[in-house]
Amino acid sequence: MAAVLQRVERLSNRVVRVLGCNPGPMTLQGTNTYLVGTGPRRILIDTGEPAIPEYISCLKQALTEFNTAIQEIVVTHWHRDHSGGIGDICKSINNDTTYCIKKLPRNPQREEIIGNGEQQYVYLKDGDVIKTEGATLRVLYTPGHTDDHMALLLEEENAIFSGDCILGEGTTVFEDLYDYMNSLKELLKIKADIIYPGHGPVIHNAEAKIQQYISHRNIREQQILTLFRENFEKSFTVMELVKIIYKNTPENLHEMAKHNLLLHLKKLEKEGKIFSNTDPDKKWKAHL
């Protein structure tokens, strides 16, 4: 069990974590939001969920304690537990100008409305740099968890704000495994020292953690490929594969296992290692 996270905690000279006060099975102890910089105006990364007054009061406490204000808001991805608090922050925390709220666009691009439509996103792109006193953040497009996911490299600390690409404990969920694995490999190349994750405690052995995430998925992939190689003339439905590969997993978890397995199959199909037919009862087979 991870140590209990404080609601407001200074993690370094330029990073303060404010906990989203929204604990749950997917959010762990809550969404980590971060005030980044050293000056009278700092960047806020992520905003927690909507309608969580405890979070707003923790954020106000942090701004008072560190004698600072919000320069702009950067959202790592569209999920509600990261973008949902924008409206409440704009309403409850006074600013002399309208907050600038930044994120990467959805892919394929689509209109995104914040709350009741009073605020609009300013869209970033991979490689953009966001600066404030004491901090330089470089945008890293890391799709996979979602199609618009970004991590941010804090250059002064060689640290990564990983959003939901990497968590402080356990593993994450993803929409596209092919993209997700490529994103992990890109993050590994940075050779970061620290990861400030979207949920859970700070990760001090950044490279080892990323490598662990990659290995975890590779082991499962090898298991799937071995099964296809040993049965290269056979084709399988997803549930047939689940019953073989997850045979030691309780049956009530097979639906979740099916979701994960399907993402692995789609990745392997993209790579030309297996193929599927177009029947209603889709079957998968080794690509010789």
Swiss-Prot record:
InterPro entries: LACTB2-like_MBL-fold, LACTB2_WH, Metallo-B-lactamas, RibonucZ/Hydroxyglut_hydro, Sec-metab_biosynth-thioest, WH-like_DNA-bd_sf. Its EC number is 3.1.27.-. The keyword Zinc applies. Zn(2+) 2 binds at residues 81-82, 118, 164, 199. It is an enzyme of class 3 (hydrolase). Monomer. Endoribonuclease; cleaves preferentially 3' to purine-pyrimidine dinucleotide motifs in single-stranded RNA. The cleavage product contains a free 3' -OH group. Has no activity with double-stranded RNA or DNA. Required for normal mitochondrial function and cell viability. This is Endoribonuclease LACTB2. It comes from Homo sapiens. The gene is LACTB2.
